[in-house]
């Protein structure tokens, strides 16, 4: 087993007791909830006449079903209106802070937590959402949990978990122009597979990781679960502390100095031991795209789509299904594949630096969205939306032909009205390309970085953004 890692230190600090099942009871530092996975948990509390143990450690927002075009109440979608009303009642009844649509702070739960300063190094964080691993970018242990576990955390502020092994993922070198954090994580998942991380927590490190912004680190940790890992994290450093300082719920004054001292102590020791280590050359990574129906079916923009006939039987059936669904053939690259929709959003890539990079590229290219492409930008939070508007980014997107929307999960999972239609193919900055993920059972999704989404939007087809950059 690993020793001296951040994972070991944070785990041990939060361990309450060992259970007869072999699991460890862990105290939860922060519990984030939203409108989709929390109602049943609150219902179970009521059935057992239980209360919320630590309401000050629970924070709520609405993101999955909220409309991004019109927030006038009641919502046009009756189900969305009902789910929001239930969350309003539950948070009021149990004295839980709720970042509601009128607060100016509503947004995707994994965007709101960090920008509010709720996410802090050394915490254990849980949420009824797979991508809670996002918070690991701050040196936390972030775990997605199910409804019964949400109930348990509400009632006890604890969770039962098995300890995982730790795999160090070292990314050396420097990224080239047109290559971003999204490309790093797609490369990792493409190489290690969607089940490669089962039984592991990933620790990301190396020069390429250290050089990323906090938003970039969040993109990488966000998709750890897509590679099978239970969580992923980056050791906190000066970049982490600079991002956090001054945020609404971050420590301040003398408490800030004490907190930084504490956070530095949880970093993995220089002589920490890992259960496995995998190394990547960041300078060799090119813009990545998916060609299939899992995030693991990813390749560089210049690489040919693999031939299922050359795969082992375990991968062959999935690859054949993917090619049939995507209407692709082996041997060709993804460059030149026609795009119907361009989606810039999700808890992976809808933060302010993502929007800045995308808007900057649009200005550099000086070109509008292609005539036959439906393009939208969905900021990760109302805070991101306001900042983007203040900086003029929203105007850049609108002038180029992007639809500028309100904050929410939107087309990442198609639970509101933002959905693909029929066989549309979407160039998407989101995290999952499963069949039916974006609202249409026949819709097709190609995952890529925000810059690659912009390139696809203006060209009308999947495009190597580096070529466009060289031409301007």
UniProtKB/Swiss-Prot annotation:
One of the record's GO molecular function terms: metal ion binding
Ribosomal protein keyword on record: no
The protein's annotated pathway: Amino-acid biosynthesis; L-leucine biosynthesis; L-leucine from 3-methyl-2-oxobutanoate: step 2/4
Binding of [4Fe-4S] cluster, residues: 347, 409, 412
Entry cofactors: [4Fe-4S] cluster
InterPro entries: 3-IsopropMal_deHydase_lsu, Acnase/IPM_dHydase_lsu_aba_1/3, Acoase/IPM_deHydtase_lsu_aba, Aconitase_4Fe-4S_BS, Aconitase_4Fe-4S_dom, IPM_dehydratase_rel_enz, IPMI_cat
Record note on cofactor: Binds 1 [4Fe-4S] cluster per subunit.
Enzymatic class: lyase
EC number assigned by the record: 4.2.1.33
One of the protein's GO biological processes: L-leucine biosynthetic process
Entry-linked PROSITE patterns: ACONITASE_1 (PS00450), ACONITASE_2 (PS01244)
Keyword hit for Iron-sulfur: yes
Reactions catalysed according to its record: (2R,3S)-3-isopropylmalate = (2S)-2-isopropylmalate
Transmembrane segments: none
Keyword entries, A-Z: 4Fe-4S, Amino-acid biosynthesis, Branched-chain amino acid biosynthesis, Iron, Iron-sulfur, Leucine biosynthesis, Lyase, Metal-binding
Short name of one Pfam family: Aconitase
Subunit structure: Heterodimer of LeuC and LeuD.
Role, per record: Catalyzes the isomerization between 2-isopropylmalate and 3-isopropylmalate, via the formation of 2-isopropylmaleate.
Similarity annotation: Belongs to the aconitase/IPM isomerase family. LeuC type 1 subfamily.
Name by which UniProt lists this protein: 3-isopropylmalate dehydratase large subunit
Species the sequence originates in: Salinibacter ruber (strain DSM 13855 / M31)
């Amino acid at each position: 087993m690993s020793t001296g890692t951040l994972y070991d230190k944070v785990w041990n600090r939060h361990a309450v007791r060992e259970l007869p099942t072999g699991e460890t009871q862990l105290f939860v530092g922060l519990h984030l909830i939203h409108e989709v996975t929390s109602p049943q948990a609150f219902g179970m509390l009521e059935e057992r006449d239980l209360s919320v143990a630590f309401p000050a450690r629970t924070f709520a927002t609405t993101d999955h079903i909220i409309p991004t075009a019109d927030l006038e109440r009641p919502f046009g979608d009756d189900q969305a209106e009902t789910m929001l009303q239930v969350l309003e009642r539950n948070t009021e009844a149990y004295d839980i802070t709720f970042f509601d649509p009128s607060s100016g702070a509503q947004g995707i739960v994994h965007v709101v937590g960090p920008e509010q300063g709720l996410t802090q190094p050394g915490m254990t964080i849980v949420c009824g959402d797979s991508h809670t691993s996002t918070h690991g970018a701050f040196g936390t242990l972030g775990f997605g949990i199910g409804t019964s576990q949400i109930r348990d955390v509400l009632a006890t502020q604890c969770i039962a978990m098995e300890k995982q092994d730790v795999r160090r993922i070292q990314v050396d070198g420097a990224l080239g122009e047109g290559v971003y954090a999204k490309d790093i994580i797609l490369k990792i998942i493409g190489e290690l597979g969607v089940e490669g991380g089962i039984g592991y927590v990933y620790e990301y490190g190396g020069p390429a990781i250290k050089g990323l912004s906090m938003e970039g680190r969040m993109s990488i940790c966000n998709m750890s679960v897509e590679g099978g890992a239970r969580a992923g994290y980056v050791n906190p450093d000066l970049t982490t502390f600079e991002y956090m300082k001054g945020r609404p719920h971050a420590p301040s004054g003398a408490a800030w100095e004490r907190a930084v001292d504490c956070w530095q102590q949880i970093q993995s020791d220089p002589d920490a031991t890992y259960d496995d280590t995998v190394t990547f050359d960041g300078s060799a990574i090119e813009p990545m795209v998916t060609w299939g129906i899992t995030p693991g079916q990813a390749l560089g923009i210049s690489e040919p789509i693999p031939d299922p006939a050359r795969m082992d039987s375990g991968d062959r059936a999935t690859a054949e299904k993917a090619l049939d669904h995507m209407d692709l053939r082996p041997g060709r690259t993804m460059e030149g594949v026609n795009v119907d929709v361009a989606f810039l959003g999700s808890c992976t890539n809808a933060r302010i630096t993502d929007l800045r990079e995308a808007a900057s590229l649009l200005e550099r290219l000086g070109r509008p969205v292609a005539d036959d492409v439906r393009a939208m930008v969905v900021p990760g939070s109302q805070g991101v939306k306001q900042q983007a508007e203040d900086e003029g980014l929203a105007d850049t997107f609108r002038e180029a032909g992007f639809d500028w929307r309100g904050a929410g999960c939107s087309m990442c999972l198609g639970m509101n009205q933002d959905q693909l239609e029929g066989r549309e193919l979407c160039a998407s900055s989101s995290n999952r390309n499963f069949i039916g993920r974006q609202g249409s059972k026949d819709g097709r999704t190609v995952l890529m970085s925000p810059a690659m989404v912009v390139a696809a939007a203006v060209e009308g087809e999947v495009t190597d953004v580096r070529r466009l950059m060289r031409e301007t």
